[in-house]
A protein has these predicted regions:
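A conserved beta-strand element that flanks and buttresses the S-adenosyl-L-methionine
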Residues: 1
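A conserved structural/catalytic subdomain of Rossmann-like adenosyl-cofactor enzymes
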Residues: 4-205
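Conserved hydrophobic/aromatic beta-strand scaffold that supports enzyme active sites
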Residues: 84-86, 254, 282, 307, ...
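Short, conserved charged micro-motifs
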Residues: 93-95, 313-319, 354-359
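Non-catalytic DNA-recognition/assembly elements of restriction-modification systems
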Residues: 144-239, 245-261, 354-392
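Glycine-anchored helix-breaking recognition loops at helix->coil/strand junctions
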Residues: 169-171, 198, 202, 304, ...
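General detector of folded, globular domains
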Residues: 226-229, 254-255, 282-283, 293-294, ...
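A short beta-sheet element
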Residues: 265-320
């Protein structure tokens, strides 16, 4: 077992990467030996070509058994989020081998004021559960353990391979629709109703009808299947960096990584060196990572958001997808953003039709019915308030 020296590696000196030290250790152990290393999670993500080459070389001669993601406070006060990687030496990694990836961030230790890192009463049971999963004595949900094949360019971490197979609750979609309607109303109140003058262009005949009450409430009754984001959206493109000091006065929404106000950070007038989009989703790739919003009007995208576009979708389908995609936020955070590689690997769970294809008709009609319900509820409330006022 080893904790390699702190990385001083670079493109010009790849030998000083933690992973390079790990490779040297593996090469030094006799065949079929077990090697355990504790390294920063960043060392197994393989951000550079040099690091990916090291990972590729390790797999040529040794077997990766598994990686355990640890509590970010394991080395309290250091500011490094570690993981444990386990290898078998001298045996080339078979491409079909299932590698065990475990999320052990919740290990039963917590930081307490004036005491530092403290072991709680739950720590022992959590450790036993970890061992039972590792040695296949029991089954664990995918949120805790994922077993999968690996590639050198992959990030050897649970978060990279984890995919939630939980069907979103109806309340998730209700909130997405309510938040969007609130944003739209807010813009009208602020005198920015012209932003939505092309609103009808965002509607599609695919959602021309409403499905009945008994069907649209039963999300769980639909068959769901996973799909890569790259198969759902025709275009996935990051916005462009624009320093705040370079903003000019204007009336075009500037979408950044905020989780509030439909992602609108401010309004600007820049026309050069910017990326302008319309009628698509924006996904926060940093900051409030995972926050996803439908953008019906022309906007300027910062580099902190990624555009997700399919020209065949209307606003109702987009809103359904926004609710689903927002769920991936649990995998990300301040220390783990959505880069181009991660988004290409990302998958979402969608309802399917009889052909096992995404049921966009259901998605659109479902959200249209939700909109109808929310607006009807508002009309009843508004009518009641007016009647009450008139009686006085």
């Amino acid at each position: 077992m080893m904790n390699p020296p702190y990385s001083m590696g670079s493109r010009n000196n790849a030998a000083l990467y933690e992973l390079s030290f790990t490779g040297h250790l593996l090469d030094s152990i006799t065949r079929d030996g077990k090697v355990i290393v504790i390294v920063p999670q960043s060392s197994v993500t393989g951000k550079t070509k040099e690091e990916q080459a090291i990972k590729d070389n390790i797999l040529k001669y040794h077997t990766l058994e598994g990686v355990i993601s640890l509590n970010k406070n394991t080395f309290y006060g250091v500011g490094t989020t570690p993981c444990i990687a386990v290898f078998t030496t001298g045996i080339p990694h078979h491409k079909e081998k299932l590698v065990t990836f475990i999320n052990f961030e919740d290990d039963g230790f917590e930081v307490q004021k004036n005491r530092g890192l403290v072991e709680t009463s739950a720590a022992r049971d959590k450790k036993q559960h970890l061992l039972d999963i590792w040695f296949s004595r029991t089954e664990g949900g995918s949120k805790f353990c994922v077993k999968t094949t690996v590639e050198p360019e992959d990030e050897w971490l649970h978060a990279f391979y984890y995919f939630s197979d939980s069907i979103p609750e109806k309340s998730v979609f209700q909130k997405t629709m309510a938040d969007y309607l609130t944003f739209e109303f807010s813009m009208f109140v602020q005198g920015r109703g012209d932003l939505f003058e092309n609103k009808k262009d965002n509607d599609n005949s695919i959602t021309a009808g409403l499905i009945n009450d008994t069907e649209w409430e039963r999300l769980a009754d639909k068959k769901w299947r996973e799909f890569p984001l790259t198969s759902v959206f025709e275009t996935i493109q990051r916005g462009k960096r624009l320093k705040r000091n370079d903003h000019t006065e204007g009336c075009v929404p500037y979408i950044s990584s905020t989780s509030l106000n439909n992602g609108v950070d401010c309004f600007i007038g820049n026309t050069e060196g910017v990326r302008v989009f319309r009628n698509c989703l924006t996904l926060a790739n940093s900051g409030s990572v995972g926050s996803t919003f439908f953008q019906p009007c022309t906007f300027i995208a910062s580099d902190h958001v990624t555009k997700l576009e399919n020209k065949n979708f209307d606003r109702y389908i987009y809103l359904f997808l926004a609710a689903v995609i927002s769920g991936i936020s649990e995998k990300y955070g301040f220390n783990r953003e959505i880069n181009d590689l991660r988004i290409k690997k990302e998958k979402i769970l969608l309802p399917v039709n009889k052909k096992d294809e995404p049921d966009y008709i259901f998605m659109g009609a479902f959200m249209k019915q939700l909109e109808h319900e929310l607006l009807h509820r508002y009309d009843i409330h508004n009518s009641g308030a007016n009647s009450s006022g008139a009686s006085h």
